[in-house]
Amino acid sequence: MTDHVKAGPGGVMTDEVGVITGDVTLTTEPAADGTASVRIQYTGAEEWYTLTGSPAPLPPGGLAVFHQHVVEAVEAGGAAEVPDTLS
């Protein structure tokens, strides 16, 4: 799943380059082991980064619920990471 969003104040934390801010594109991809990975990039850029906390276990609601929680965290900002508790 992919969405284009504006990172909230304080941006989002990536493993590779630290905090990124502004307009970003994020994508969540499920894995066979019941986890999902989250990658993020500046919208229109070529480089993708790993959102800190990824991969993470999928919640009972599956990928759509996981993706929505991540979108909400990114929109909230504050050096957002993949939320620890997804239920």
List PLM regions with ranges.
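Mixed-charge, Lys/Arg-enriched low-complexity segments
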Residues: 47-49, 55-87
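Generic alpha-helix detector with strongest preference for long hydrophobic helices that associate
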Residues: 5-9, 19, 44-47, 51, ...
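Negatively charged, low-complexity tracts enriched in Asp/Glu with abundant Ser/Thr
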Residues: 1-27
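Amphipathic alpha-helical interface segments used for dimerization/assembly
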Residues: 28, 36, 40, 67-74
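A short, structured beta-strand/loop element
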Residues: 32-49
